[in-house]
Amino acid sequence: MASRHYSAKNTTKKIRNIGIIAHIDAGKTTTTERILYLSGTIKHLGNVDEGDTTMDFLPAERERGITIASAATSFNWNNHTVNLIDTPGHADFTFEVIRSIRVLDGAVCILDGVAGVEAQTEKVWKQASEMGIPKIAFVNKMDRAGAGFGRTVKEIVSKLRTRVALLTVPVFSKSSDQVFEGVVDILNGCVITWTTGGDGKQTVVVPVSEASAEVQEEYQKARTALVETLTELDEELVEKFLESEDYMQITTEDIKRALRTATINNDIVPVLCGASFRNIGVQPLMDAVVDFLPSPAERPPTDALIAKSYTGGKKSKVIPERAITLDDSMKNLCCALCFKVVQDPQKGTLVYVRVYKGELKQNSVLYNTTSGTKDRVSRLLKVHADTTSEVTSITEGNIGVILGSQGLATGDTIVCHSIKKDGVMKLPPDNRLIQLKPIAVPPPVFFVRIDPASIGDTRPMNEALELLLREDPSLNVSFDDETNQTTLSGMGELHLEIAQNRLIEDFKANIVIGPIIISYKETLNEPTKSITKTVEPEPGAVSTVRLRLEPITEMDEACENENVIDHEQNTVSFPYELSDADLESVGEGNQRISFERDTKELTPEIMEECFRVGSIPPLVSCGPVCRLPLRSVRVVIEAWHIAQHINNTASLKTATRLAIMEALSTANATLMEPIMNVYVSVNEADIGLVVKDLSGSRNGQIVSIMDPSQLNEGDIHSEEYVAMATNTYVPADYTMYLSKHQDQTRTQQSVVHARVPLREMVGYLKTLRSMTQGRGSFTMEVDQYEAVTPDKIQPIVDSIFA
C-alpha cells in the first residue's frame, strides 16, 4: 500500500471533525452512505435493509440493521477534509456515543420527520451540549406519509432548547399526492429538486424568482425570519439592517458570517431537511457542515491534566494533579487521545486517535501517559470504514489510526516529540504526565458468566476477553478466585449479546455463556464491631490499624476527612493526627502502641491513598452474602500506626485490607438491587396494558403518565423554549393530512414513567412490542440502588449461585 502525504490545503482550518447523532432508525447510516457516495468516496450506494452499508461493517451490524460501533471515515467536500463518525442510536451503546462525541468539533443531528424529537435524540443532544459541541439538525424522511417539517422544528426548539435557523424548507409536487421532491435554499435564493429515483447527483436548480408565487412567498418569510433571529445575536448585522431597514436587503455573505459565529458559539442551530433514502437534500447538508461547523482551530483550547505524581526517598510526597490547557507554549509536543480500539481480522489492532497538539509521525516513539509505557508507531492510516490508505503523519486537529500497537487502549493519552521521532524523553517532565480528561465509563448493570468449554480453552478465552476490553472499556471482566468463575458485565442486554458474538464469531473463543444476571450489590444493615490488625513483614516493622465498617444512609452527613473510594458510594474516613487516647487503644489486649514518628513524611494525601487502596479489594469481592461488591459502606479508621523507620505505607495497606475482610466475615448484610427510571412511550390505547404489566407482574411503581411535552413541565427554562417554539417561523405542514391515522397515532402518544427493579426488566422489549403491536418504545436509566425485600433475597441468592 503506497504511503502519501495530505497536501498543504488540508490545514487545520480546512478540517471538520463531525459526528452523526440521533435516535435509532432516524437514518444516520443511510445519510452517511449518501454523503460518501456524493463525495465520490464510494462508487456503490449501500442499503441498511440489505446489509451492505459501508459504515456498518461489523457482521452484527449488517445482520441487525443497526450501528453498534462508531465507524470513522475521511473524505473531501468543497476543498475541506471531513472526518465523519457514524454513531449508534441504541441506548445500550451510550458509551460508544460519548467517546465519539469527545473527539468531535461539530455534530449533525438526524431527526425522523414523522417521529420528531425522540427519547434518544434528547439524550445524545444533551451529551453533545454538555461538551459544548456546535450542532446542525437535519430533518430526514420528508418523503414519508405523516412527515411534518414545521412540527419537528418546533419540537427542536421546545424539547432540545435551542434557537433555530432554517436553511432549507421542503418543496412538494403539485400532484394530488404531493410527493416530496426538493428544497428551497434560503441562503442562496433557489429551488433545488432531485430526479425521482435518481442517485442524488442529478439536480435542477431554479432561482426563486422563477418559482411559483407560493414558493416565493415562503422564501421571503423564511429569509426574513432567519435574518430577524440573527439580528438578536449579532450587532454587526443589526447595523447592516439599520442601513436599509429591510431584512431582504441583507447580503448572503453577511448572513453566513453571522450564522457561522452564532453556530460556533452554540447560540443557534441551522436546520435543513431531506430524504436520505431518496437521495434528496444531502448536498445542502454537507455545504452547511463546511460553512457553519467549526474547524479544530475554532474550538476552545483543549483541557488536560498534569497527573498526580510522587517524589521518592525519605521525603516522599504526593504532587497533586493540576488542570492545564494545551497551548503554543508547549514546544515540540505532540499530544493525542486514543478514543477507540478495534481488532480487525485482516489488519490487526487499529487504534483511532485524535491529535490535539503537534503532529504524529510514522516511526515516532510514543509515551503512554496513562500506563507509563513506551511504544513505537509503525504505520499510520486514514480510514474509510473497513478500507484504509497509509499516511506518513497525522496533523494537528486530524483523526487517524495507529496500526499494530498492542499497548494502547481506549481512553489512553499519548505524547511524543513532534520533530524528533525518538525525542519523547527529551520533552519536559510535565509533558510526560499530561492526561487528556478521561472518558467516564458508566457503571454496568447487567452481567453474564463466561466459562471456557474445556480447560484448554481457558487461555484463548482470557486473551479474547483482553482484546474485547481494549475495544470497549464500558465492558468489565471480573474473576472470582473462590469459585473460578469469570463474569462479563455491560450496559444492557443487547450490549452483552453483541459482546458475546464478538468473542465467539470474531475472536473464535470456545466458551459457554450463562443467562443474563442483574448487577446486585451488598450493603450493611448495621455497623460492625471494631477490628484491629497488625502486620509485621519483618522484625520491628510493625503497622497496625483499628477500624470499623458502617452503612451510609441518605440522611448521613459526611465525616471529617472522608474520601470517596469508588463509584459504589463507599467512603473511608481517618484521623490524620491521633490523640493520646487513640494511641493507647490501638493495640489489642495489654499491647500498647506508641506513636512517636515525624508525620511530615506521611502527608494526608499519602495516607488517603493508603487507606483507599487498602479498602478496595475487600469491598469489591468480600460481600458476606454472595461475595458481591459492597455499596454505601463507610470505612472508619479509628487509629493507625506505622513503625518510625518505615518510609512507605505498603504494610498498612495490607493491615487495612485484612481488617476489613475480618469485619465483613461476621457483618450483618443484605442485598441491594438497581431500581430503574423507566420511560415507556405508547399510544393511549395501549396505556392500560402497559401500566398493568409494569405495576403488576414487574413490581413497578407508576410515577406519572403524561404527554411528552410535559416531561420538563415546571422548568422555567423549558417554558421559555416552549414559548420560543410558538413564535418560531415554520412553513405549513401540507402533507400531514395524507396520513391522518399515522399523525393521530403519533400525537396521542403518552409517556408512562415508572420505577421498576432491573431484574423485572430483563426481556422487556419483546413484551412491550407484543403488547403494542411494535409501536411502543422505552428508555431506562439507573435511579438508585435499594435494599431487596426480605422475601426476595433467597431466590436471588439461589439464582446467583445456580
Curated annotation (Swiss-Prot):
Keywords: GTP-binding, Mitochondrion, Nucleotide-binding, Protein biosynthesis. It is found in: Mitochondrion. GTP binds at residues 22-29, 86-90, 140-143. One of its GO terms (molecular function) is GTPase activity. It holds the Pfam family EFG_III. Residues 13-297 form the tr-type G domain. GO terms for biological process: mitochondrial translation; ribosome disassembly. CDD domains: EF-G (cd01886), EFG_III (cd16262), EFG_mtEFG_C (cd03713), mtEFG2_II_like (cd04092). SUPFAM superfamilies: EF-G C-terminal domain-like, P-loop containing nucleoside triphosphate hydrolases, Translation proteins. Its main location: mitochondrion. GO terms for cellular component: mitochondrion. This protein may be expected to contain an N-terminal transit peptide but none has been predicted. PANTHER family: RIBOSOME-RELEASING FACTOR 2, MITOCHONDRIAL, TRANSLATION ELONGATION FACTOR G-RELATED. Mitochondrial GTPase that mediates the disassembly of ribosomes from messenger RNA at the termination of mitochondrial protein biosynthesis. Not involved in the GTP-dependent ribosomal translocation step during translation elongation. Belongs to the TRAFAC class translation factor GTPase superfamily. Classic translation factor GTPase family. EF-G/EF-2 subfamily. This is Ribosome-releasing factor 2, mitochondrial.
